[in-house]
């Protein structure tokens, strides 16, 4: 197709665009500011004005309506894709049979769910699982949950960025070794959705309330994702991704177990280096000589080692030299990052907060929001303690600490160190800000007059 019409029009003229195969016009007129011949943008600095940007954005509200009855996203020549039949699920499953390695998990014949569902016309069962996890509330909340640092700096990892990096490592390995990429990605994205606020300290906090303790992997598969009706292979991989758990039932699940360890060892070190907690010169030579000192070098080497072992030996494992270097890196991180005195103090404060919240909401389930009285389908009336654990475990770091201030009346000094108090929204912060706008004894506005809305008043309103 060849675009043959004008691309800009004067004010009030609807642009008509014609190609050899389709004609269409904009859904509404839009205005183009008069142009200076020496400055076609109408701006002396060559940049469009704010009003121009707003008008152009508004003109795209409903897209470009084509004469053939379709709507185009861009006021430009359509990109032609002709002679294509939809690639349906059954055909893609057949492709898997010819592409994937022996022993890989095939989508066809797999994907048993607790509650049977009709198949999707285009997506495999594991692609549906991946999409459900990706769009879930539990996955989004990982953005507000600790990886290593409570309330990390902008460039430091959260549980969400960790999950994304695990998915990248795992799918790189799965693709190179002809395993099921969609299943691998689903397990990787969902593997940490059972974590509570404050990182692994939450497992210690919640463990005393539950028979058998609290394991984020098991909790994620059996509680958080229970209502999503995921495939048994996906749930198995999530439930058993930790090395202390039984071996996953699929090779894709084992790949995620390795990818999780590879990713967090490399990126936790990088975050600690940037935070000034450790220095490169502290790394043992047994690490740097084998896998390097940077995240990119470590990922490249360890992914290559895993792929190489799988393709040479036919088992999801790693040769000893690389595995020993990974183990040494993990030990270094434990000694210098995870168990440093500041980290232990932070974890202790997190445990105190979470235990107090569970006790509070198990004794007063009516104080939780209505939707939170049956978290993940658990009935607070039938089992108030387990329901309280589920409610608190679903909180982000920030929300849990707000609850401690608002519901428990805690002083901020009891919270984990490093928390940015102005970023929270507790009643304590509102009371503090009320002093800035006149305090509780500030005179009431005259009848018929609204109170002034200066910057401090607007700040207080935004915290409500």
Where are these regions (language model features)?
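Histidine-centered, transition-metal-coordinating active-site segments
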Residues: 1-160, 170-173, 180-182, 202, ...
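Conserved catalytic Lys-bearing alpha helix of Rossmann-like short-chain dehydrogenase/reductases
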Residues: 163
């Amino acid at each position: 197709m060849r675009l043959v019409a004008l691309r800009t029009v004067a004010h009030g003229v609807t642009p008509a665009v014609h190609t050899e195969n389709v004609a269409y016009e904009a859904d509404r007129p839009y205005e183009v500011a008069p142009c200076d011949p020496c400055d076609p943008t109408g701006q002396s600095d060559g940049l469009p004005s704010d009003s121009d940007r707003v008008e152009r954005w508004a003109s795209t509200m409903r897209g470009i309506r084509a004469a053939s009855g379709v709507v185009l996203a861009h006021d430009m020549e359509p990109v032609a894709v002709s002679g294509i039949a939809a690639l349906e699920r059954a055909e893609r499953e057949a492709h898997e049979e010819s592409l994937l390695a022996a022993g890989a998990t095939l989508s066809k014949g797999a994907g048993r769910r607790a509650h049977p569902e009709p198949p999707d016309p285009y997506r495999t069962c594991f692609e549906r699982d991946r999409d459900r996890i990706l769009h879930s509330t539990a996955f989004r909340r990982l953005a507000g949950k600790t990886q290593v640092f409570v309330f990390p700096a902008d460039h430091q990892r959260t549980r969400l960025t960790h999950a994304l990096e695990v998915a990248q490592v795992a799918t790189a390995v799965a693709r190179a070794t002809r395993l099921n990429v969609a299943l691998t990605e689903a397990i990787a994205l969902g593997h940490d959705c059972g974590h509570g606020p404050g990182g692994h300290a939450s497992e210690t906090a919640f463990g005393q309330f539950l028979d058998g303790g609290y394991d984020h992997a098991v909790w994620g598969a059996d509680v958080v994702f229970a209502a999503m009706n995921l495939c048994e292979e996906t749930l198995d991989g999530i439930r058993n991704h930790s090395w202390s758990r039984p071996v996953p039932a699929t090779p894709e699940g084992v790949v995620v177990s390795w990818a999780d360890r590879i990713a967090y060892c490399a990126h936790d070190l990088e975050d600690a280096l940037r935070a000034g907690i450790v220095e490169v010169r502290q790394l043992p030579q047994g690490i740097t000589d084998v896998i390097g000192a940077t995240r990119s070098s470590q990922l490249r080497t360890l992914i290559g080692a895993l792929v190489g072992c799988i393709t040479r030996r036919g088992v999801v494992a790693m040769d000893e030299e690389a595995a020993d270097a990974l183990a040494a890196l993990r030990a270094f991180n434990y000694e210098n990052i995870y168990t440093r005195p500041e980290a232990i103090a932070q974890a202790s404060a997190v445990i105190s907060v979470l235990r107090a919240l569970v006790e509070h909401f198990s004794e007063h389930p009516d104080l939780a929001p209505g939707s939170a009285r049956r978290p993940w389908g658990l009935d607070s009336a039938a089992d108030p303690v387990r329901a309280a654990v589920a409610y608190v475990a679903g909180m982000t770091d920030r929300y849990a600490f707000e609850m401690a201030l608002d519901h428990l009346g805690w002083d901020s000094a009891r919270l984990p160190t490093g928390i940015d108090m102005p970023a929270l929204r507790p009643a304590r912060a509102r009371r503090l800000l009320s002093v800035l706008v006149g305090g509780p004894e500030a005179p009431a506005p005259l009848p018929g007059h609204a109170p002034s809305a200066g910057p401090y008043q607007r700040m207080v309103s935004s915290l409500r």
